[in-house]
Amino acid sequence: MSFEGSSLWRLRQKVGHDLILWPGSTVLVEDPNGRVLLGLRRDSGEWAMPGGGAEEDGSFASTALDELRQEVGLHAVRADLIAFACVSDPQDHVVRYPGGDLTHYFGIWFVLRRWEGEPVADGEELLEVQWFDRDVLPAELMHSSAVAFAHYARYLATGIFQVG
């Protein structure tokens, strides 16, 4: 779904650019070689993991699966999503978009290692998709994705669900 017409877009019509608190999900797609899938965002020119805000009647898991399908064309099932962190720290998760909208995201981050399909950018939110080694990420990485990789590294090292 494009931003226009989404639940968040409808709310924006009422509150303008004011701060909105919004639930969402992000998916760290990891292939068998340990590479991660990132998309180049049209709005910011930064690389980021697939993800986005929840829609009405959605859950964290359904949001993750919907965003994965919509943004990069991959299909997965809920049982293959592994939650590794929940996030809400305003220092890391308040985003001011180029148009001026201010959003504080509260979300769950999932890792996904099994899916169907080949990744393809949607052409609307993402201009391209690319696999990266986790240790060699692009300099133009969206801040929230950089935070996600730090949480994921701690999760892998400890096996403990991360809170941030």
Named regions from a protein language model:
Residues L74-E118:
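Active-site segment of metal-dependent pyrophosphate-handling enzymes
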Residues D31-H75:
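Conserved Nudix-box catalytic region and its N-terminal flanking loop in Nudix hydrolases
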